[in-house]
């Protein structure tokens, strides 16, 4: 983590519970990010916090540190039952819930507090088995949480800490009624510590904070610019016919260590995946059609470096905490201006630099003016030589769709260390 991303404030300066401080030190966390430096003094004194911060600013560690400290510093409800968690962390997507749970593991191991995870689409019985043994902190998505609550597998009557992550995204996905349903089953707002984090503190988010929090303090960490000053942005204007060849040429020239390629539809993502897989790249595909177990496996492989490239729809544009993404390619310019910001925000995180490359083709170039108006700046344009683009590329792989599942049967062969591409040449 770059020191330029951190403040002079140290975790050890706070009166944190010794077990929490020990866990942070073991993970190498010494100095706070701006959102941590602003939020922790409030939460450690028992004040509710509504924080505005983009992903990659350290907000997850801010609310996890606060949650673990509070539970270790305050006794559980005396007549608490085994199906009553003490803290609830709500996330808009299963990927984000899994990531939060993973980030909390180090704190859990050092403190002895038990973690639970609840998300839809997969693992119902496995998740339930953990819950039945009793958990202190439950991370989940609203649909699965409501399912378990209605069947009395969980009871929210002993909640002492509640966190709502990416509150604006909750609204976008239509989950606000679910959130209110869950809040109604918790103790009163003044009997729990409440934290809310959002990329924007819009009127509707502030309204939710007013309803469900106890005189929350608002803290805001604005990026120096919406797209991040550490991200180098670049724009090309390819024809539809040259778009794929340009992408593959740029990948060969940049040779990114870890990159995400975004397209606007699942069919376009499948097409991009097919071309890159056929060309020998280690590439994974992440769309809404990919089964949950496979989604998690692909994300794990990408995070561990077993895959170099992830092709994704906007399902992966927000909430995923994947470190060291060096490049983001917008194969399609998004229709939503905010999606552009969230896409390229996958790189240049935690003080690192990043590179964003967008292809403004004939189909989506009309989206560019709105994006540049929203970000407040023009994206630098680069030119390319059509004669220098790669040619003689192999025919794309097609997705095998076995009975009962979708998505590729396996990821492509390793990109590095494989057979040489003797038939590769540039046109012209």
Swiss-Prot record:
Broad class of the protein's primary localization: cytoplasm
Compartment(s) of residence: Cytoplasm
Keywords: ATP-binding, Cytoplasm, Helicase, Hydrolase, Nucleotide-binding, RNA-binding
One Gene Ontology term of the molecular function aspect: ATP hydrolysis activity
Domain Helicase C-terminal, chain residue ranges per copy: 245-390
Motif extent (Q motif): 9-37
Domain spans labelled Helicase ATP-binding: 40-219
EC number: 3.6.4.13
Single GO BP term: RNA catabolic process
Listed PROSITE patterns: DEAD_ATP_HELICASE, HELICASE_ATP_BIND_1, HELICASE_CTER, Q_MOTIF
InterPro entries per the UniProt record, alphabetical: DEAD/DEAH_box_helicase_dom (IPR011545), DEAD_box_RNA_helicase (IPR050079), Helicase_ATP-bd (IPR014001), Helicase_C-like (IPR001650), P-loop_NTPase (IPR027417), RNA-helicase_DEAD-box_CS (IPR000629), RNA_helicase_ATP-dep_RhlB (IPR023554), RNA_helicase_DEAD_Q_motif (IPR014014)
Disordered: region residues: 392-428
Recorded superkingdom: Bacteria
Motif stretch (DEAD box): 165-168
Residues binding ATP, per UniProt: 53-60
Pfam families noted in UniProt: DEAD, Helicase_C
GO cellular component: cytosol
Catalysed reactions, as listed in the record: ATP + H2O = ADP + phosphate + H(+)
Record field: compositional bias (Low complexity): 408-421
Subunit structure of this chain's protein: Component of the RNA degradosome, which is a multiprotein complex involved in RNA processing and mRNA degradation.
Biological role: DEAD-box RNA helicase involved in RNA degradation. Has RNA-dependent ATPase activity and unwinds double-stranded RNA.
Family membership noted in the UniProt record: Belongs to the DEAD box helicase family. RhlB subfamily.
Matching NCBIfam families: PRK04837.1
Name used for this protein in its record: ATP-dependent RNA helicase RhlB
